[in-house]
């Protein structure tokens, strides 16, 4: 995989115009564009089609979590939209994950297209050990152990990989093997402003830990020259 293919640019912007301007400039320099709840709910499914038309691939970050039939039906729609990746909550359980994987595979075969990569979200990065125990009710298990348990469960269900914080990359890689995809959000090059993050993981560090893809937003989108910022990160990954 080439260095630029590892970069997923987070389109955390408020309008179609802002998003498509970034896609036009950066499609040759990144592997995919992350469309999250804000942009998707603002623009609808057409934003995925427009990004594809501009030569970009889409990671649809909607974190599906519902009964198996409902999530499987969503998987069919995502396949028709020609998404590159999408994600579901591992907490939805084995049957939900199995059904969406099967539905996506069948729909892709019917349409003669590549099936999108399916990713599981394990424990949200905003959840602390205390919240896991007191609010969610999971007691007697370390957060990292639960992340690895759910990653293994997702793999057994045919899910392609996980979205993981940098802190769990190495444990997931050791448990799930080299073919299981790991997508890591919140990556920031050392030269970028840290904003509200006290600790950062750089693209190079994430790659060394075992990440396949890294989600990067503000260090590129808010740079004076986004293309130059992307090229600088590509250079770091190639070192």
From Swiss-Prot:
Q: Which residues belong to the signal peptide in this entry?
A: none
Q: State the disulfide connectivity.
A: none
Q: Name one Pfam family in it.
A: OMPdecase
Q: Where is the active site?
A: 63 (proton donor)
User: What residues does substrate bind to?
Assistant: 12, 34, 61-70, 125, 188, 197, 217-218
PROSITE patterns the UniProt entry points to: OMPDECASE
Does the keyword field hold Zinc?
Answer: no
Family (UniProt): Belongs to the OMP decarboxylase family. Type 1 subfamily.
Q: Please explain the role this protein plays, according to its UniProt record.
A: Catalyzes the decarboxylation of orotidine 5'-monophosphate (OMP) to uridine 5'-monophosphate (UMP).
Q: What is this protein called in UniProt?
A: Orotidine 5'-phosphate decarboxylase
> What is the native source organism of this protein?
Syntrophomonas wolfei subsp. wolfei (strain DSM 2245B / Goettingen)
Please name the gene that encodes this protein: pyrF
